[in-house]
Amino acid sequence: MLFQKIKAYKWQALASLVMTGLMVTSSLLQPRYLQEVLEALLTGDNEAIYTIGFWLILVALIGLVAGGINVVLAAYIAQGVSSDLREDAFRKIQTFSYANIEKFNAGNLVVRMTNDINQIQNVVMMTFQILFRLPILFIGSFILAVVTLPSLWWVLVLMVVLIVAMTGLMMGMMGPRFAKFQTLLERINAIAKENLRGVRVVKSFVREKDQFAKFTQVSDELLSENLYIGYAFSIVQPVMMMISYGAVFLSIWLVAGMAESDPSVVGSIASFVNYLSQIIFTIVMVGFLGNSVTRAMISLRRIREILDTEPAMTFNDVEDEELEGSLSFENVTFTYPNDEEPILKDVSFDIAAGEMVGVVGATGAGKSTLAQLIPRLFDPQQGSIKIGGKDIRTVSEGTLRKTVSIVLQKAILFSGTIADNLRQGKGDATVSEMERAARIAQASEFISRMDLAFESPVEERGTNFSGGQKQRMSIARGVVSNPRILIFDDSTSALDAKSERLVQEALNKDLKGTTTIIIAQKISSVVHADKILVLDQGRLIGQGKHADLVASNPVYREIYETQKGKEE
């Protein structure tokens, strides 16, 4: 997967490899030129000193310039690859159903798209900056070191075997630790996100200490894992350096006698030590980068999990003709993922196009679940749902979204402008269409008072608006597309009685022919509906007009009388 992403930057990658070749060539030539300069100094050959010195400086400059260019190329490739991965992951997430989202959870997905992709970006950059250079530099330095002083080949082999063994052991031990670290990082992000989103609840019930204790518990586990990893590397790195420096000192001690008897080998000794230093550099860097590479491999696996996940539901790709607004449930049974007990049980009913239908029942009866099945946010395990006589599982997503609009119980706004939020309901909505939607939702008054009207800014989650204003904008977003079926999932609960009545009057006047389904806690919200469905413990136990249900349905009558008593 990563290789395919890098292929999109093949010319930059090729240029980076050329720069890497120049850098390695420069590094391998410099000790050889240094050897020749030292030998020329011993013989007093000034002309050779100047000539070789010129080439030494030129080669060093070429390596320096190539290194600078390579840094730019590596950064370009790494940032491009990470951007492509992030876009692919986000595009994939957009196809996920609620079930897919719940499988990962939102905090987990955010960590994967930020922290994990940053880990991959860092390693891609290091790969083109350093990792590609290391094996070539290692092999070249090893060969040239043996050619320079063949008698010391065994010192090199011993050093390499010891360091490689330690590096392999370290990476094997740290893999599970890095995986656990990423999991803890997800948890701490999820806790922080949950706490910030629910800050009003936390403060209202004075639960700051409990939330802090929950956060610090995971934070301490995260710290413990991080310290373990740090301690492990703090032990391994000095040991590797001791092995490396031991090889240098051993080499110098072994050749010291040679220099006394034959001063001309001083250049060879200097060249050998330089090559040995480069070998040490490559091995130590591999060990040092092993931490990042191991983390990145785990991160890549986690990104692949997103990209390889198949959406829990698929849609017909062929756009359908416009559907009419009739709706029918036929023996629908639905159970949420990871739950055992169905939330809806064998529910059947028919709604004619243009009807206003209320859905009532006690908390947990399945009202909101029923609403979420209509736009196909979930699929039932049994039975079928039909709109305009067509099973919604055979309808394209585009057609279904144009036909059905839902106004959720909790008003969710996005940062941007009021117009941006209304156009979530219809991407090409005109100003006149937005004005009409705002008028129906009783939002025109407060929007018109704002200096920028529909271009007024909306902060994250709409925190610069009151609950009632957010709900009105949410309703406007739902009606702006003039859908065939409009669902209110208890979405008028944040409105006062007068505003709720005005919204219903506007709906009756401006959306004639639209099938309206109102999920309500208060029977007063649906008392004038053409039909009311009564749910109890996931079953449809009655349907009809208000007066008929009061007379014939004990559950409905009990809810009605209880609410009526409270109002009185």
What do the predicted segments below correspond to?
Residues 1-8, 109:
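A short amphipathic helical element positioned immediately N-terminal to and/or at the very start
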Residues 28-32, 68, 72, 138, ...:
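Membrane-embedded alpha-helical segments of multi-pass transporters/permeases
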Residues 8-10, 95-99, 115-124, 128, ...:
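An intracellular "coupling" helix at the cytosolic face of ABC transporter transmembrane type-1 domains
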Residues 45, 144-161, 228-302, 306-307:
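Helix-loop-helix
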Residues 7, 11-69, 73, 146-151, ...:
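Transmembrane helix-loop-helix hairpins at lipid-water interfaces of multipass membrane proteins
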Residues 322-568:
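ABC-type nucleotide-binding domain
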Residues 43, 79, 87-111, 115-117, ...:
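Short intracellular "coupling" helices and adjacent cytoplasmic loop segments at the cytosolic face
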Residues 18, 26, 48, 66, ...:
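Hydrophobic alpha-helical transmembrane segments of ABC transporter permease domains
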